[in-house]
Amino acid sequence: PLMCHTPFLLPSYKSLWHSPNPPTFPPTFIHMAINRYSRLITYHGPMGVDFKPERKADIDALFNTLEGKLQVIEPLPEPPRGAIGTELGEGILRGGNMTILSMLSGTPYFLEDASWEDTLLFIEDVGEAPYKLDRMLQQFRLSGLLSRIKGLVIGTFTDCEGDDDERDYDLGYEALRYMEENRDPELLDPFVCYVTTGHGTPHQTLPLGAMINFRYISNTIIVHPYTK
């Protein structure tokens, strides 16, 4: 099975989309390779174990997304940060598990530099203490990624509270600060929004590699019908 910690599969990534039935729900390692080297859209969403009657809303949203229907994700769990206005924040959604993204940084399977400026970076994680999350954020900062992406879509960070002295750590606040740092004045102001996707419930399905819109005022994410 494809699990989160399977980097040994990456050298064979090309066989995944030359297959007559390429996987569309791979872990972050494979999400990134497929999204970088092909035009396939992959999906970050519920797994088979989540197909339960009490998860009907998640499953309905999953199949609507798979069918390419217009999706409006609302309400989002927290108010947005950053560039708040009447315009849409628009970009290509890329990313996945934050720990794995940091592992891939600097490799041929990470985001191509030329794609950074049209990217809305999605991150989520589970079981990582705040000091580890900040270390990963610093890696993205020092690489120049945060100062160039359009925005950050923060998913669910399950069991990431840390010790009592770490509970005040605010990932969204710190990320926005770094996104504004050394930013090219020709780029639009960055923003941070939040979505319930990651580990736990509810779990929205996100199409990685697709164009999405974020509406600042209504605090909603819009996934438009797409073909690739």
What residues fall within each predicted segment?
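C-terminal active-site/capping subdomain that shapes the small-molecule cofactor and substrate pocket
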Residues: 132-228
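Short, glycine-/small-residue-enriched flexible loop/hinge segments at domain edges that mediate gating
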Residues: 1, 121-125, 150-155
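Conserved active-site and cofactor/substrate-binding residues in soluble primary-metabolism enzymes
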Residues: 25, 29, 53-57, 92-100, ...
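Structural motif
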Residues: 20, 40-42, 91-92, 99, ...
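Conserved anion/nucleotide-ligand pocket segment
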Residues: 40-102
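Short, acidic/small-residue loops that bind anionic groups at enzyme active sites
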Residues: 10-34, 41-46
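Oxyanion-binding "anion nests"
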Residues: 94-134
